[in-house]
Amino acid sequence: MDVSSDTREISVGGNDNIVKIYDISNLESPILKFTLKHQAAVKAIAYCPWMPSLLVTGAGSKDRKIRFWHTKTGTLIDSIETEGQITSLIWSKSCKQLVASFGFSTPDVHDNDKSVLLQVYSYPDKRTVTRIIASTSMRALSSSISSNYDTIVLAISDQSVRLYNIWKASHNFSCGSFEGGIFGSNIIDLDEGIHDSFEVIR
């Protein structure tokens, strides 16, 4: 479950393989806006802190996809195929990146005793920035981010807690102040007030 940075929406995932997006502008009368289907239970949900209508979701072992949604329209913008069960997703507040933690994963191609525990992606190009490999016996159960937004805290299946310094929190993005390409659609970008520089057609 997560709430958008403008506090107008809440998204809830469950074992029914569905994410439900509610308009909570009026807390006394929440309105169901969209149901987003997945192929497995959805545990990982995160609204983008610098673009309130950008939602990312991650599902279990039978799905293994990170999906990006435009919550004003319910549009699936993009997705990333991963190597395992997605247990958490966290956006950076200092750069356009996203970190995913993994539970049950496919063993690493170079070492069958290792698998991906944590992976950082850039957005919107979805490039892998960093990946942390661990023993296949280790699974990330859940994660959180430090109060200064630079360290990821993982709860591990071996009853340990691990801290990874991922980002330098030197500055924070402000909502909506970005170039085009965030949503992968010129129409959605225009609706969000995001404009690319281009020559006027006369």
Question: Which sequence ranges carry the predicted segments?
Answer:
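Per-blade loop-tip surfaces of WD-repeat and WD-like beta-propellers in eukaryotic adaptors/scaffolds
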Residues: 4-8, 15-42, 48-53, 61-63, ...
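Short, flexible, glycine-rich and Lys/Arg-enriched loop motifs at helix boundaries
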Residues: 58-62, 103
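Terminal intrinsically disordered, low-complexity extensions flanking WD-repeat/beta-propeller proteins
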Residues: 76, 81-87, 92-97, 101-202
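Loop/turn segments within WD40 beta-propeller blades
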Residues: 2-8, 46-52, 90-96, 144-149
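Residue position within the beta-strands of beta-propeller blades
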Residues: 12, 56-57, 100, 154
